[in-house]
Structures are given as structure tokens and as C-alpha cells.
UniProtKB/Swiss-Prot annotation:
This is Kynureninase 2. The modification N6-(pyridoxal phosphate)lysine is found at residue 274. Pathway: Amino-acid degradation; L-kynurenine degradation; L-alanine and anthranilate from L-kynurenine: step 1/1; Cofactor biosynthesis; NAD(+) biosynthesis; quinolinate from L-kynurenine: step 2/3. Its cofactor is pyridoxal 5'-phosphate. The keyword Cytoplasm applies. Homodimer. Belongs to the kynureninase family. It comes from Aspergillus clavatus (strain ATCC 1007 / CBS 513.65 / DSM 816 / NCTC 3887 / NRRL 1 / QM 1276 / 107). Catalyzes the cleavage of L-kynurenine (L-Kyn) and L-3-hydroxykynurenine (L-3OHKyn) into anthranilic acid (AA) and 3-hydroxyanthranilic acid (3-OHAA), respectively.
Length: 464
């Protein structure tokens, strides 16, 4: 069985469908110890409607919903407690006091602590990343800076089934410029009867609209189908045709190996509460390539030249931030896109989640993820035919074209019954109307034995 690369598809032996084989994969998993760094919800707690403390039941659920919300790292409580203790003990001095026994920097530099760790997750220089805001808010800020339509180049290319918030954001920016979204939004979809959008089709749309498109914004991973787009190839080609290129990495952050700097991406934004495990509604992140974040002082210290953006005091250089002279001098890089003083509590939760990523690498996580999702696919398809299965896997089969998630399109009328049966069995995954179950085994805390158990329970639910 090949497990050395993420481009080749693992192959499995004849006994792969046994629980013993799944256990052998767990026994040889170099990342198995990371599961102990998380609080796994118990079966008893997920069935209860009362607020319960973790650990009341010894039997954990099977949590395959990290593509919607990751589970809580054990470090989160420690980091939040440290932040609350800092606030309660020294008050406003927490902005500038580096508390020696705290895992967190002083509040003034806390966003930089998060950005440094996030930069390693997305393959960027620390100066190219900012920890701030939430995903759609950050997309708005980035579009305000990078979408500069003209009379001839005004269209935005996007995927046909973008997450609604992305659709709303793009639509509103087009309307803000007194343009008609029906004319200026170009949706790229799959061919009739399919779900995957071939890279060649995206490139053909870029060619078709090279003269009238200003920008292309795509998801790194399509939230519904789980398709991973060829970020490097699409970025390079779109830029060669004169388009600005942005990426929504909500489902790619913490999931796949990214190299945003090397791929020359113009801008990107992501949330951190899915595979990033930073908590519901957690502080998000954005990327601005270094070539767009430069600040030019050749015309004098009081006349900095920089890329247009919506500005706020927290994006100002820290050396002059408190001078209050109304002369904005942005932090070079993505930090110059910050608007307001970020929540130290939210940053504590984010830094706690990132502390887990600091102990490994995206290359290692991706290696396990490729094997785990391939094993899931192998078990789902074993001893079935296209005609006999009550579901279709609409996620691409090639590892290079997907992340952790597999999207299962069930036959009409099965979704709610199957979802209920899985929940009763203590399995948490995600459903999307009209008939898709999204299953995402996460390499940080899920096991191969859980994959085996899930498939057994799913098949039992379908047989019922």
C-alpha cells in the first residue's frame, strides 16, 4: 500500500474491510497521539439537551463533522483561563505586559502570534497573514481593495454553487459600483449531470472573459462536493490573462497543504472553526501577497504610498499607532488591512487551536488524511456496483482533487432517515439538502477504526 505521497491513490489489501485491519492502521499511525489533545464529545452528551460537562460518558461519539465545526482542543480552556486571569489581575496593562507564565503574548502583539502560526498552515510569510475578523467580513475588505472594475473589465468569475455568503458579498460589491450582478457575475458550473468542474473548463472561462473580467474568486475546496481546485494552475493562468485572483479557503485551511506565497495568490480568506478547531464563529484569517502589501515612503515619511483598502487604526504601524495624528501609515503586509482592536478572548481560542498545529506540519496531516479518506472511499465502494448502491460519491476520486471530505448523494427520500439513524448510533456528520451527507474524517483526532465503524453503520442504515 502506497502512503508516501498525496498525489498517488493508496491501494488496500483483501482484508482491508475488517476491523482488525483498521486497528492495524491506527497502531501504525504516527499522528495517533494528537487525538488526546482534543475533547471528543460523548455519545451521552450528544443525545442530551442539557448543558453537560465533557467526560460524563466514557464512550466517545464518532465525530466526522470537522468540515462544519471542529471539536475543542484541550488547550482552549488553558489559554482562555490565562487570558481571563491576565484581564482580571492587571486590567489595561495586559495590552503591553508580557506575562511570563502565560502561553500568550501581550494583547498588543497577540494577533501577530496567531498570524505567525497561521502562516505555516497556509504556506505564507508571517507578514502576509493577518488574524482578524470573520470570513465574509474579510472578503468584503479584500474585495474593496482588489476589485477595481472599469467600463470594460468589470466581471467577477465564481463557482456556480458558491457558499451563499460569498455570493452575497460579490453581488453587493458589484452593485456598490452601480453595476448589474446579472451582467457582472459569471458562474462556472459543471457539465450537465456531473458535479466536478474540470480545471480545463475554468481555464476556458478565463479565456472567454479575459477582456471583460476583473477578478476571479473561487473556493479552494467546494463546500458541497468537496472538490479541491488546482489553486496553483488556476492562479497562474488567470493572472497571465490579466485577472486578479482570490480564494475562499474555508474548507482548505487546516485540511490540505497550501503554498499561497509560492503559488503567487493575490489574496485569500478563511475561517478557522472547521478543520482549524478554533471554536464556533472564531476569528478568521486573510492573506495578502507581499507584492500587494508594500508601503512606499520614497515621497517622504508623511506620504506613504500603498494599495488602496478600507482602513482603521489597528492597521496602522505600531510605531505611530498611538500618536493620534490622523496620518495613516499602514503596517507593511496583511497587517495593514486590520481595522479594529481584535478580541483578546477570540485570539486566545485561536492561538490554542494553532498550538496543536505548531506540533506537526500540514504535510504530515495531509499524508494521513489522504490515506484515511481513501480508506473511507474503499470501504464505501467495496462489494457494490453503481446500480446497487443507494448513494453516489460526488467528490472526485483522485486525492489531488479532494481534501478530507467525501460527499455522498443519497437516493431521493433517504437523507433524513439515514441522518437520524447515524445520530442514534452516535455518529455526527453533516447533511446538506436535498440529499447529501458530507463525511469528513479529520487526521488530528479521528481514527481508522472510526472510519470502519461509520461505514458499517451507514450500510445498516441504508439497508433499513
Amino acid at each position: 500500500m502506497s502512503t508516501t505521497t498525496t498525489s498517488s491513490k493508496p491501494e488496500f489489501p483483501a482484508d482491508a474491510a475488517t476491523k482488525e485491519y483498521a486497528a492495524s492502521l491506527d497502531a501504525s499511525d504516527p499522528l495517533a497521539g494528537f487525538r488526546e489533545k482534543f475533547i471528543i464529545p460523548s455519545k451521552a452528551n450528544i443525545a442530551s439537551k442539557k448543558l453537560a460537562k465533557p467526560g460524563l460518558s466514557s464512550e466517545p461519539c464518532i465525530y466526522f463533522c470537522g468540515n462544519s465545526l471542529g471539536i475543542q482542543p484541550k488547550a482552549t480552556a488553558k489559554y482562555l483561563e490565562a487570558q481571563l486571569d491576565t484581564w482580571s489581575s492587571i486590567g489595561v496593562s495586559g495590552h503591553f505586559t508580557n506575562v511570563e507564565d502565560s502561553p500568550l503574548r501581550e494583547w498588543q502583539n497577540l494577533a501577530e502570534q496567531a498570524a505567525e502560526s497561521m502562516s505555516r498552515v497556509v504556506g505564507a510569510a508571517p507578514e502576509e497573514v493577518a488574524a482578524m475578523g470573520t470570513l465574509t467580513m474579510n472578503l468584503h475588505l479584500l474585495l474593496a481593495s482588489f476589485y477595481r472594475p472599469t467600463a470594460t473589465k468589470h466581471k467577477i468569475l465564481m463557482d456556480w454553487k458558491a457558499f451563499p455568503s460569498d455570493h452575497y458579498a460579490i453581488e453587493s460589491h458589484i452593485a456598490w459600483h452601480d453595476l448589474d450582478p446579472k451582467e457582472s457575475m459569471v458562474l462556472i458550473g459543471p457539465d450537465e449531470g456531473t458535479f466536478e468542474i474540470p480545471t480545463e473548463k475554468i481555464l476556458s472561462y478565463i479565456d472567454q472573459h479575459a477582456d471583460d473580467a476583473a477578478l476571479i474568486l473561487l473556493p479552494g475546496i467546494q463546500y458541497y462536493t468537496g472538490q479541491l481546485f488546482d489553486i496553483q494552475k488556476i492562479t497562474e493562468y488567470a493572472q497571465s490573462r490579466g485577472l486578479v485572483v482570490g480564494w475562499d479557503l474555508a474548507h482548505a485551511y487546516g485540511n490540505v497543504h497550501l503554498k499561497l506565497h509560492d503559488w503567487n495568490v493575490d489574496f485569500a480568506a478563511w475561517c478557522t472553526y472547521k478543520y482549524g478547531n478554533a471554536g464556533p464563529g472564531a476569528m478568521a484569517g486573510l492573506f495578502v501577497h507581499e507584492r500587494h502589501g508594500r508601503v512606499d515612503y520614497r515621497e517622504g515619511e508623511d506620504s506613504p504610498k500603498f494599495r488602496h483598502r478600507l482602513t482603521g487604526w489597528y492597521g496602522g504601524d505600531k510605531s505611530v499607532r498611538f500618536k493620534m495624528d490622523n496620518n495613516f501609515k499602514p503596517i507593511p503586509g496583511a497587517g495593514g488591512y486590520q481595522i479594529s482592536n481584535p478580541s483578546a478572548i477570540d485570539l486566545a481560542s485561536l492561538c490554542a487551536a494553532l498550538s496543536v498545529f505548531d506540533e506537526t506540519s500540514m504535510a504530515e496531516l495531509r499524508r494521513k488524511s489522504v490515506l484515511m479518506t481513501a480508506y473511507l472511499e474503499h470501504l464505501l465502494l467495496k462489494d457494490t456496483t453503481d446500480e446497487s448502491r443507494l448513494f453516489d460519491i460526488i467528490t472526485p476520486s483522485e486525492p489531488a482533487a479532494r481534501g478530507a471530505q467525501l460527499s455522498l448523494l443519497l437516493r431521493p427520500g433517504l437523507l433524513h432517515k439515514v441522518a437520524q439513524r447515524l445520530q442514534e448510533a452516535g455518529i455526527i456528520c453533516d447533511k446538506r439538502e436535498p440529499g447529501v451527507v458530507r463525511v469528513a474524517p479529520v487526521p488530528l483526532y479521528n481514527t481508522f477504526t472510526e472510519v470502519w465503524t461509520f461505514v458499517e453503520q451507514l450500510k445498516a442504515a441504508l439497508e433499513e
